[in-house]
């Protein structure tokens, strides 16, 4: 603890300010956020003056968290003062400071050694102002004395003033982008006043930056960044020898060159586990391959360097490539800086073609020529001769095709269900990795519980059967089930769960920011119903298209089989804010027809003699699209023409028509007015469940009629 550096400026802050209620978030208001940098002193100074306006503000503001990297930085505290009216209280007590390991990325198996100093302030009250300042001394030695950073001019809480002051050595080149500075007393100053709180809409693409910022950098070109990186990826003699010996093993065990390349890729991906020890120099510099081989772990840098050197020993041209999984195609809009990159992959050139290989993807299938290319936009090739970014041409063989076949020999015995799911490309990679992380029994339990959402009385007929052709990267899972009482109510409703998970709506529908959409995506779901009677259903088909996707749906019949086919293919990964309304309209159109109700005439509900068996007529079969679309009614072939009618889901009858309620009492009121189809209004055995459907939380009340025993489910959602 010591006073602020002499080169800093003390900025006035009016602690008597009384912000309007609409200018407060989380119970706090920032009067000043000040940041000053001296490049020659390798020191950054920070000061925050924050007003606490409510008990929740006390909770949010009374614990200070200051981050630093002890491998090359030193945290220096200057002062912590609580201002209460005209009274200023020194609140900096050494006994109230705790230093803990930060490790924000521990769940991703990345450990960078950063620390957080926590200061627990005592006796903070609403109306107080907390004024605290600190400095970080030291610069990352890997940058070789060069400076690059990005300054925020936005904030999550409202701020009266945000200020950045940069003392820059005379004669050194400096580039900036985002806002022009003022020059005050030989320093560059960027400032924003009366800054509203930043509202980030949900579902934005990773590349979209909603905040205002200024990028500053001493790097003058991408060539300079590439040369900096090239110096990091230097091989020592021990690594060269050990990798050469490893390459000889692959040559001895695999005859063809393609097989050797595939073996090398899979060795790095599968046999070297992903773990990032990114402390000190290894925040940017990879470990030597011999270290990676000895530890059998590594992060993206370590794995890529090992893979590149191994491929070179096998006679393949390969280079490390820096990419930004966040900025993607927007990387080219930034000024050159090493800090823009968050991942490293390998550029592989073979037979005149360029491929991109990610060494961190375990269980990946395919060969060099067929593996999916990550869509990271642009890459900086780590090579001394690199002068510009290289565009990555993304390729995808990914698809998922779910085929569900229901066979009902009659409507009293259990219905047979076979589910066959075919995964290709990165969908196969993901499924292969998922299966590798669990037992077959666990996977079987996961699957049957997913299917039980729509078919509660489902039983497995053995364990799932998995066939994996890793070379072609095609993985097929086959499941068999029996479903009891599927037709108990005389009909059954079906939802394409796989498709609907990709058709969610954002919470913020009136948008100022773009909306992300899963891409690349190709999902198909085919459902065939083999029934106990003829089902001459009218053939229908529909297509819904938007800039982001193409959706197709069709209904067909052949003898006793009804087939529903649906597919969704993405076209791009984002929707501009101005196009979101049209996108949501298209989604609503799909939701209006995405599910089906089946009511074959032979599957009558279990009711008393007042029987509704003539409801559809002998041999009638109905496929009804949700939300009151036209119903395709077909009869067994007979002289009279098929009738056409309309069936709508009554309020509360299905998830899509869930009743909106504000209080629990309203649920009771709705239930009291709802009669069974037999006319009775007495029920027993009520059961309450919670579920989530189409981004909505549902309450489902299931009960049985006291007269006929028929089950009734009523769906509610909160207002």
Q: What is the meaning of each model-derived region?
A:
Residues 1-628:
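A sensor for short, sequence-defined functional sites
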Residues 2, 207, 636-638, 652:
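Compositionally biased, intrinsically disordered/low-complexity regions enriched for serine, proline
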Residues 31, 617, 631-632, 658, ...:
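Acidic/proline-rich low-complexity IDRs
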Residues 256, 419, 634-636, 702:
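Short, intrinsically disordered low-complexity segments
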Residues 303, 620-627, 633, 679-681, ...:
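General secretory precursor processing signal
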Residues 628-642:
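C-terminal membrane-anchoring or membrane-association module
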Residues 639-719:
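Cysteine-centric segments in proteins
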């Amino acid at each position: 603890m010591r006073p602020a550096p002499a080169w800093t400026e003390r900025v006035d802050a009016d602690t008597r300010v009384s912000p309007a209620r609409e200018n407060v978030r989380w119970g706090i208001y920032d009067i000043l956020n000040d940041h000053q940098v001296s490049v020659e002193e390798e020191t950054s100074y920070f000061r925050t003056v924050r007003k606490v306006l409510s008990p929740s503000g006390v909770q949010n503001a009374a614990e200070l968290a200051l981050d630093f990297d002890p491998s090359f930085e030193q945290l220096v505290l200057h002062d912590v003062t609580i201002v209460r009216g005209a009274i200023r209280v020194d609140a900096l007590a050494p006994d109230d400071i705790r230093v803990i390991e930060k490790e924000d990325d521990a769940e991703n198996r990345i450990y960078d050694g950063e620390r957080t100093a926590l200061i627990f302030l005592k006796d903070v009250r609403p109306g107080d102002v907390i004024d605290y300042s600190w400095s970080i001394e030291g610069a990352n030695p890997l940058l070789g004395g060069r400076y690059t950073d990005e300054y925020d001019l936005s904030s999550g809480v409202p701020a009266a003033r945000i200020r950045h002051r940069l003392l820059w050595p005379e004669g050194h080149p400096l580039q900036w982008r985002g806002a022009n500075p003022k020059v005050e007393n030989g320093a560059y100053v960027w400032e924003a006043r009366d800054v509203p709180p930043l509202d980030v809409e949900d579902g934005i693409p990773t590349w979209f930056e909603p905040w205002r910022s200024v990028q500053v950098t001493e790097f003058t070109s991408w060539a300079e960044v590439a040369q900096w990186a090239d110096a990091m990826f230097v091989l020592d003699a021990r690594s060269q020898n050990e990798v050469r010996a490893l390459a000889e093993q692959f040559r001895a065990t695999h005859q063809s060159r393609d097989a050797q390349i595939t073996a090398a890729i899979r060795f790095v991906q599968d046999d070297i586990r992903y773990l990032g020890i990114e402390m000190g120099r290894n925040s940017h510099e990879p470990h030597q391959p011999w270290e990676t081989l000895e530890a059998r772990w590594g992060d993206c840098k370590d794995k890529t360097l090992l893979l590149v050197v191994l491929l070179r020993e096998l006679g393949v041209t390969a280079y490390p490539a820096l990419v930004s999984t966040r900025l993607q195609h927007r990387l080219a809009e930034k000024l050159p800086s090493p800090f823009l990159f968050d991942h490293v992959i390998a550029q592989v050139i073979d037979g005149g073609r360029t491929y991109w290989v990610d060494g961190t993807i375990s269980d990946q299938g395919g060969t060099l020529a067929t593996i999916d290319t990550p869509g990271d936009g642009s890459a900086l090739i780590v090579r001394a001769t690199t002068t510009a970014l290289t565009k990555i041409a993304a390729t995808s063989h990914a698809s998922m095709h779910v085929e569900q076949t229901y066979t009902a020999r009659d409507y009293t015995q259990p219905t047979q269900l076979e589910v066959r799911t075919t995964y290709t490309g990165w969908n196969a990679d993901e499924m292969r990795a998922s299966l590798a992380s669990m037992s077959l029994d666990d996977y079987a339990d996961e699957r049957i519980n997913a299917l039980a959402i729509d078919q509660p009385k489902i039983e497995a007929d053995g364990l799932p059967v998995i066939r994996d052709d890793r070379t072609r990267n095609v993985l097929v899972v086959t499941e068999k089930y029996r479903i009891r009482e599927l037709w108990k109510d005389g009909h059954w409703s079906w939802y394409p769960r796989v498709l609907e998970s990709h058709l969610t709506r954002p919470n913020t529908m009136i948008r100022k920011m773009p909306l992300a959409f899963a891409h690349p995506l190709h999902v198909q779901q085919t459902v065939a119903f083999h029934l106990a009677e003829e089902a001459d259903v009218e053939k229908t088909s529909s297509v819904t298209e938007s800039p982001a996707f193409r959706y197709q749906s069709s209904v067909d019949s052949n003898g006793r089989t009804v087939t529903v086919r649906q597919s969704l293919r993405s076209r791009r990964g984002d929707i501009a804010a101005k196009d979101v309304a049209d996108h949501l309209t298209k989604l609503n159109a799909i939701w209006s027809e995405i599910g089906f109700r089946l009511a074959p005439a032979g599957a009558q509900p279990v009711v008393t003699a007042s029987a509704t068996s003539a409801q559809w007529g002998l041999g009638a079969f109905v496929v009804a699209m949700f939300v009151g679309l036209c119903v395709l009614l077909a009869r067994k072939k007979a002289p009279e023409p098929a009738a056409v009618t309309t069936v709508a889901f009554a309020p509360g009858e299905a998830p899509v028509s869930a009743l909106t309620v504000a209080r629990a009492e309203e649920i009771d009121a709705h239930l009291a007015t709802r009669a069974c189809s037999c006319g009775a209004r007495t029920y027993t055995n009520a059961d309450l469940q919670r579920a989530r459907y189409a981004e909505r939380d549902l309450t489902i009340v299931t009960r049985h009629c006291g007269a006929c025993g028929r089950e009734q489910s009523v769906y509610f959602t909160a207002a």
